[in-house]
Structure formats: structure tokens, C-alpha cells
């Protein structure tokens, strides 16, 4: 192995291929024949590998094939997420390689990705957040103060994913206060109280409407901010009903459980704790909530 100083001499900015100038690396003894040999110095462009990484990840330890054909049933990729530059460069090359592999019978589909989501950038005072600009935020400091769930909630609530997000400390504080209210109400309804169930119908209608809204926004529209807004609106309605004593304990518990399940992909830590506190059937990775039948 060359010393770092010797290697730096070889790789100084010069015309041509730096590997071709590294004689110690290039000229070797063949490990199979014992004869003198010359290593290949041409290299692939980075896109040659990155254009089909999603295929290799299906079968990363296969030493005989790119990937086993049994994994074709997993294709095409359901969701491609990347920055705007991906839509011009990587997406173009990935589609090119995929069509080549299709022609060779390695895949069956014409396109590698079903859906594309190009997310926006994070801005600070209107400028792109980057290390070179010195305007980045240390996530560890924010997490220590507010918790990881608060940061996750803020990032997904502050703007639609395809738009730029303006970093705002005050908005983080707002998300933190909402989660504190959510926890407080959840803790409150652990203690059984009851009122006539015929007063529950209005909030249970809201319960079903919220499940429909959040399901559509998350899984079809990829509109995470409006999904969170729908849960917050539902929470405010439930909070008023509890304060007014116009909802039964069982219905309030159902509503809290549903909200925790709807927010679980976004704020998993507090939702797990809430589901545990109200003794939900499954607190870890719960099933998506069902609508209540017979409510209209």
C-alpha cells in the first residue's frame, strides 16, 4: 500500500487517468498464473452502479447473478423519492438501464418506478440550508429539547413534501405544544367516566371522516401536512367534547386510540406510549384504524 504522501502525488490534478499513472498499482503479478499483468484502469461512471441499486438491494449477497429472478414479483418499485436533480439525471439513467434489463429478460416491466415524488429543499431565512453556507441546524440539539417526534411532526406539517420547507423555531414549538396536549388528554381519559352514549354520534361521525381524510392524504395524495391537519382538527373536536362532558369514556378512548394509530407513522414514540397507557390491543406497530359501523 502506498503512503498517503505518495498516493497524493499520483492523484494530483493532472490531465488523463490518475490510475494509469499509478504504476505500482497498475503493474502486478497475476494471482492465478504468476505472470506479469496489467490492471484495467478505466472506471465506470457512478451512474452505472447507482442506476440499478434498487435491484441489487433485493439480493445483495448473490455472487452469481445481479439478482435472483424470483424477486421480479417485487418489481417495479412502488415509490421513488428524490430531489429535483434526480428527476433529470438519476431517473433518466435508471429508466435506461431498466429497459435494457427488460430486453435481456431480467425484468418484466417497462418502467422501474410506479410513482415519483420530488421533495423540496429545507431553507433557513430564505436560503438553502447547507454546510457550505454555515446555516445548518444540529438535529441533536433540537431533539434533546423537543424530542424526535416533534421534529418529525414539524417537518411533515410545515409544507407539502414537493415544496421547499422554511425552517421555523416557532413552528417547532407549536408542534411540541400539540403533542403535549395530545398526551395530556390521553392521560386524562384513562380514568373512567361516562355520559349517555346517544351524545357520541357527532364526534364518531368526525372519527370516520378523519380516517377517510388521512388515509387518502397519506397513501394516495402523499399530502402529509393536510393529513396531520385533519388529525389536529379531530383532536380539537374531541378535546371540546371531553371538556363539555358530551362524550362517553369508551368513545373518547376509541377516538384517542384512532388518533394515535393515524399519527403512528409520523410520531411513533409518543403514539406507542399513548396506546400503551390506554391499554390498546396492540401498541407496537398497530393496524390501521377501522371506521365505526352504523354511524351516520
What are these regions (language model features)?
Residues 30-33:
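Short cysteine-rich clusters marking metal-coordination/redox-active sites
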Residues 92, 96, 106-109, 141-296:
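Helix-rich, typically C-terminal accessory recognition domains appended to large enzymatic cores
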Residues 76-94:
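N-terminal catalytic cores of NTP/NDP-binding nucleotidyl/phosphoryl-transfer enzymes
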Residues 1-7, 11:
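Single conserved hydrophobic/aromatic residue that forms the stacking wall/gate
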Residues 42-80:
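Active-site-adjacent "gating/activation" loops or surface patches in catalytic cores
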Residues 38-43, 80-83, 123-148, 162-173:
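Conserved phosphate-binding loops in nucleotide/dinucleotide-binding enzymes
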Amino acid at each position: 500500500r502506498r503512503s498517503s504522501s505518495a498516493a497524493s502525488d499520483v492523484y494530483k490534478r493532472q490531465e488523463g487517468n490518475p490510475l494509469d499513472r499509478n504504476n505500482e498499482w497498475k503493474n502486478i503479478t497475476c494471482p492465478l498464473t504468476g505472470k506479469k499483468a496489467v490492471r484495467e484502469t478505466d472506471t465506470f461512471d457512478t451512474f452505472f452502479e447507482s442506476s440499478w441499486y434498487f435491484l441489487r438491494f433485493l439480493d445483495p449477497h448473490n455472487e452469481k447473478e445481479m439478482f435472483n429472478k424470483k424477486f421480479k414479483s417485487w418489481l417495479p418499485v412502488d415509490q421513488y423519492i428524490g430531489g429535483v436533480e434526480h428527476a433529470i439525471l438519476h431517473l433518466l439513467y435508471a429508466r435506461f438501464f431498466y429497459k435494457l434489463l427488460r430486453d435481456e429478460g431480467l425484468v418484466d416491466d417497462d418502467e422501474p418506478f410506479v410513482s415519483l415524488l420530488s421533495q423540496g429543499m429545507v431553507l433557513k431565512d430564505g436560503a438553502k440550508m447547507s454546510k457550505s453556507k454555515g446555516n445548518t441546524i444540529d438535529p441533536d440539539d433540537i431533539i434533546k429539547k423537543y424530542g424526535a417526534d416533534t421534529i418529525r411532526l414539524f417537518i411533515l406539517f410545515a409544507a407539502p413534501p414537493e415544496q421547499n420547507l422554511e425552517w421555523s423555531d416557532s413552528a417547532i414549538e407549536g408542534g411540541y405544544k400539540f403533542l403535549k396536549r395530545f398526551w395530556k388528554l390521553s392521560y386524562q381519559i384513562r380514568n373512567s367516566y361516562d355520559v349517555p352514549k346517544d351524545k357520541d354520534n357527532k364526534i364518531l361521525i368526525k372519527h370516520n371522516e378523519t380516517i377517510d381524510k388521512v388515509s387518502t392524504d397519506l397513501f394516495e395524495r402523499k399530502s402529509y401536512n393536510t393529513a396531520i391537519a385533519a388529525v389536529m382538527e379531530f383532536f380539537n373536536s374531541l378535546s371540546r367534547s371531553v371538556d363539555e362532558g358530551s362524550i362517553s369514556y369508551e368513545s373518547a378512548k376509541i377516538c384517542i386510540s384512532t388518533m394515535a394509530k393515524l399519527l403512528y407513522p409520523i410520531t411513533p414514540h409518543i403514539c406507542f406510549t399513548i396506546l400503551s397507557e390506554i391499554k390498546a390491543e396492540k401498541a407496537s406497530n398497530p393496524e390501521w384504524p377501522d371506521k365505526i359501523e352504523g354511524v351516520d
